[in-house]
């Protein structure tokens, strides 16, 4: 097995969520930073300061990502925004990571990401790999383009929904299946009016998530992603 870590992770995810994962892509932290730089960065509305550095590291917390509207993050700052652990909870960090992924989906052109991803892989300086066959690239690009116009939902298997020390795997699989089924139904063409709280082009939504921010049917309403 060429990538045993990837295969082990894939197997755990499939068993836990009840999903079949056909393809994967892997990029290390330096490669991620380089990819974000290569596509021109991402923009996010940031609600609170995010520290750069570690209280346990030699430099400590040495800088901050400041809050603001439509903040542009390069690769270095996008990586720290997603992974910073100080002065926050694991659940808050999970949400920041989801917001980064949502921003990438909304703002980046799939064909550009593919080109830059391949360029980074060819350079050989970072760990970049995928099992996606060349013949499936066009299909994945089409899916990515369709995904840009759809809301990204989120569910986190954390307390009180799931107890980490004694997870109910049957419940997890049921929730995943229900979420996917609901998203497929909502994506179907409908003559009904737009849901309340949805944003129209050029406007912003003020809808609050019905539960916690990590449990939402539309990350745009939580992350305020700039398009």
Residues of each region from the PLM?
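Mature, Sec-exported extracytoplasmic domains of Gram-positive
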Residues: 3-5, 21, 44, 49, ...
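Second-shell loop/turn segments in exported
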Residues: 1-3, 18-23, 83-92, 106-111, ...
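Extracytoplasmic/secreted envelope proteins and their assembly/folding machinery
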Residues: 6-14, 29-33, 37, 75-79, ...
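Flexible, polar/acidic helix-loop-strand segments at domain edges
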Residues: 34-115
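C-terminal solvent-exposed extensions
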Residues: 73, 129-227
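Structural recognition of the beta-strand scaffold that forms the well-ordered cores
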Residues: 23-26, 80-81, 154-156
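Surface-exposed patches in mature extracellular/periplasmic domains of secreted proteins
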Residues: 21-28, 46-49, 112-119, 184-191
């Amino acid at each position: 097995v060429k990538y045993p870590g990837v295969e082990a992770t894939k197997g755990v995810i499939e068993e836990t969520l009840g999903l079949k994962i056909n393809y994967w892509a892997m990029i290390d932290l330096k490669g991620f930073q380089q990819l974000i730089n290569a596509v021109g960065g991402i923009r996010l509305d940031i609600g609170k300061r995010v520290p750069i550095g570690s209280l346990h590291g030699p430099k400590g917390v040495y800088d901050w990502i400041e809050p603001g509207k439509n903040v542009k993050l390069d690769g270095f700052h996008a990586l720290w925004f997603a992974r910073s652990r100080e002065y926050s909870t694991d659940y808050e960090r999970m949400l920041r990571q989801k917001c980064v992924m949502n921003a990438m989906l909304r703002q980046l052109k799939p064909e550009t990401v593919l080109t830059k991803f391949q360029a980074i892989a060819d350079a050989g300086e970072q760990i970049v790999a995928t099992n996606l066959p060349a013949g499936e690239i066009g299909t994945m690009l089409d899916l990515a383009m369709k995904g840009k116009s759809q809301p990204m939902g989120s569910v986190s298997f954390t307390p009180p929904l799931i107890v980490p020390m004694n997870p109910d795997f049957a419940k997890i699989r049921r929730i995943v299946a229900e979420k996917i089924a609901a998203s497929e139904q909502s994506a179907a063409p409908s003559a009904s009016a737009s849901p309340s709280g949805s944003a129209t082009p050029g406007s912003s939504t003020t809808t609050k998530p019905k539960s916690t921010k990590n449990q939402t049917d539309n990350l745009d309403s939580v992350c305020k992603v700039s398009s």
